[in-house]
Swiss-Prot record:
GO terms for cellular component: plasma membrane. Signal peptide: none annotated. Encoded in the SPbeta prophage; retention of this TA system may prevent the bacterium from losing SPbeta from its genome. Disruption phenotype: Non-essential, it can be deleted. The gene for the antisense antitoxin SR4 RNA cannot be deleted. It is a single-pass membrane protein. It comes from Bacillus subtilis (strain 168). Changing E5K: No longer toxic. It holds the Pfam family Hol_Tox. This is Small toxic protein BsrG.
């Protein structure tokens, strides 16, 4: 495995973690907004 390939894997893995964090953040925002409406 070259340095470039390992770097690309690191970037892809970091993007996956970032997407997961954003997804959880969006779900939390929806839950809090729905609780305020009640």
């Amino acid at each position: 495995m070259t340095v470039y390939e390992s770097l690309m894997i690191m970037i892809n893995f970091g993007g996956l973690i970032l997407n997961t964090v954003l997804l959880i953040f969006n779900i939390m925002m929806i839950v809090t907004s729905s609780q305020k409406k009640k």
